[in-house]
Regions:
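Extreme N-terminal starter segment of soluble prokaryotic enzymes
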Residues: 1-3
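Active-site acidic-Proline motif in GNAT/NAT acetyltransferases
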Residues: 91-93, 97, 125
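Acetyl-CoA-dependent GNAT
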Residues: 5-11, 15-93, 104-106, 110, ...
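Short coil/turn segments at alpha/beta junctions that flank glycine-rich nucleotide-binding fingerprints
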Residues: 97, 114-117
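Residues forming the Rossmann-fold NAD(P)(H) cofactor-binding site
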Residues: 101
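Conserved hydrophobic/aromatic "anchor" residues
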Residues: 70, 94, 132-133, 138
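Conserved catalytic-core motifs of GNAT/GCN5-like acyltransferases
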Residues: 120-124, 134, 139-157
Length: 163
C-alpha cells in the first residue's frame, strides 16, 4: 500500500474512481439522480482542476500498482491552523483493509506539517462512515444543510478532530 500525492495530470484517475465508488457507496443514502448530479458537478475534470487551483491537495492510494482510493484536503482553510478534509474514498471492494485509515492519517500528518491543529469534514447524516470518523477521533460539532442546486441538498454533519 502506497500513498502518492498527485498533480492535475492524475486528476482523471480521481474522476474515474469517483464514478466507481459513488454509485455503490451512496445508493442507500441519496437518489440516483442526486448521485449523477453531484458526480457531474463535483468530480468532472474541470471541477477537480478548479479544486487544485484553490489549494486542494490530492493523493491516491495504490496497491499492486493500481489506484484504490483517494483523498483531498486543504490546509489553513477556512482559517489559519484549520484543515478541511474534502474527500476520502476507497473502492467498496477494498473497504476494511486499512486504506481509509491510511488516507486519513496521511491528510492529518500533512496538516500537522503545515502547523494545523484541527481538521474537519462534512459527511452525510446517513453515511455509515460517521462511525469510522468517530473511531478515529472526530466528533460531531454541528449539522448543516447545503443547497447544491437543481433541488438537491447535502444534509450533513460537520465533524472535527483536534490535536
Amino acid at each position: 500500500m502506497e500513498i502518492v500525492p498527485i498533480s492535475s495530470v492524475e486528476l482523471p484517475i480521481v474522476s474515474a474512481l469517483s464514478r466507481k465508488i459513488w454509485p455503490i457507496s451512496y445508493k442507500d443514502i441519496i437518489s440516483e439522480e442526486q448521485i449523477d448530479y453531484m458526480l457531474n458537478k463535483m468530480y468532472a475534470l474541470e471541477a477537480l482542476q478548479d479544486n487544485v487551483q484553490k489549494g486542494h491537495r490530492f493523493a491516491l492510494i495504490h496497491t499492486g500498482g493500481e489506484a484504490m482510493g483517494f483523498c483531498s484536503f486543504e490546509v489553513h482553510f477556512p482559517d489559519p491552523g484549520i484543515s478541511k478534509l474534502h474527500k476520502l474514498y476507497v473502492l467498496p471492494n477494498q473497504h476494511h483493509q486499512g486504506m481509509g485509515s491510511a488516507l486519513l492519517s496521511y491528510a492529518v500528518q500533512e496538516a500537522k506539517k503545515d502547523q494545523c491543529h484541527t481538521i474537519f469534514l462534512q459527511v452525510n447524516k446517513k453515511n455509515p462512515a460517521i462511525a469510522f470518523y468517530q473511531k478515529k477521533g472526530f466528533t460531531i460539532k454541528e449539522e448543516a444543510v447545503f443547497d447544491i442546486g437543481q433541488g438537491f441538498v447535502m444534509d450533513d454533519f460537520i465533524m472535527h478532530m483536534s490535536w
